[in-house]
Amino acid sequence: MQVFLDNPKAFFETVSGWVWGPVMLMLLVGTGILLTVLLKGLQFTMLGYALKQAFVPPKKHKSGEGHEGDISHFAALMTALSATIGTGNIAGVATAVVTGGPGAVFWMWMTAIFGMATKYGEGVLAVKYRVNNSKGEMSGGPMYYIEKGLGKNWKWMALAFALFGTFASFGIGSSVQSNSVAQAVQTSFGIEPAYTGITLTVLTAVVVLGGIKGIAKAASFIVPAMAVFYVLGGLSIIAINSDALMPAVKLIFSDAFSAQAVAGGAIGTVIRYGVARGVFSNEAGMGSAPIAAAAAKTDHPVRQALVSMTGTFLDTIVVCSITGIVLVMGLLGAGGEFVKPEVSGAALTTVTFQKMLPGIGGWIVTIGLIFFAYSTILGWCYYGEKCAVYVFGEKFAGLYRVGYVSSVMLGTVLSLDLVWLASDTFNGLMALPNLIALLLMAKVIVNETRDFKQKITNGELPH
């Protein structure tokens, strides 16, 4: 305790380094690989079907009519993506490329491929073990499937997850995101952070005070719009600079397994940063997304789990790939070699987009960053509230929302190095109990999957 009081930053640096060390990364990827094997590559064989479940309108696809839940499959996916697609898609990918090299993009893809199985497993358990609260709303997520699926003896682990999730929401969910918006607005428009903070706080309060339905409604509009805007902007840059595309893709694959990296021991760095940033971006295994999945109207846990699985695909395989490929294209030297930049994070992404598309390239990143961060604030409010209510009770919900909205304002005017470190630590601590639960309940996930396929075959459920 004294170490923490004397130097809290050093304390969290040490703890975060341990939490997100090789063991955690192996556990995250290993869980995904195990579920992929047990589910016979479901993320490959059923991806098309899963995307259809997510995006076909309810009036044409009746899976959500007359079933328990608060919001549609699509709204649940957009709520999860609102929290998932954030500054990590812009700043996180840039950090991975600078620190781990172009090959880190390849390992980010690998993390997403196996992470889809993890996200699927989370979704199955979230819907299967969800409960109705006193307001008639659905509540679910790791804290519920740990307690109900593993038994009362595991209640301590459920409480630990929920407590860590509550703390994490005030950092990575609100303060860090609002700080990113304030900096971006000040850089691009010269507006003081305090004014941005007031505006962002009001916009957040208006939405989150309406609960999950308000958040889902906002997310269902913001997320598709911002994702399409950013992806189209990135694709335009790739098309305009198409001569650099193949050299960049070739470099991504060659650097992932380069003899030089293997011989020098750098291959571990390439893999570590690719895996770590991929996990931070798509949150597969962290246990956050299943909290939103539990609110979906569905006739079977597997149907919503398939929709949840597409979130990892859209976040990393689509959005992060755009950032990664444009960055590598922009950092190619005259001889096709990778030129390590002097800047990193969101600044590097902004500079590179501007270089590749003069005039508006930087604006694509700035506008994308603003909306990505704002949507993350909305999504994480729901996650944090559900965690807080599990620990402290339903009466705490109103107090939590007030505190969360206040942290949005604080984030725009404070230095957040410590908050970043603390949030990273709590996110990792969330993942540990969740991954343990997934491994212990892998058989449940497999059995539910078999049951769904059988009912589809027998005509008991709509296809």
Where are these regions (language model features)?
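Flexible loop linkers connecting adjacent transmembrane helices
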Residues: L42-I71, T95-V105, W109, A117-K152, ...
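Membrane-embedded translocation segments of transport machinery
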Residues: K217-S220, M226-A289, A294
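Helix-loop-helix module between adjacent transmembrane segments
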Residues: L35-T36, T111-G136, M143, E147-N179, ...
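Alpha-helical membrane segments and immediately flanking helix-loop junctions
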Residues: H61-V98, L125-M143, E147-G149, A160-L163, ...
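Membrane-interface loop-to-helix entry segments
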Residues: L27-L34, L38-L51, F161, S178-V185, ...
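Extracellular/periplasmic helix-exit of transmembrane alpha-helices
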Residues: Y120-Y129, S134, G233-L251, A259, ...
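N-terminal alpha-helical transmembrane segments of multi-pass membrane transport
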Residues: M1-A83, T87, V97-A104, G115, ...
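Transmembrane helix-loop junctions in multi-pass membrane proteins
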Residues: N7-P8, L38-Q43, G88-V93, S169-A182, ...
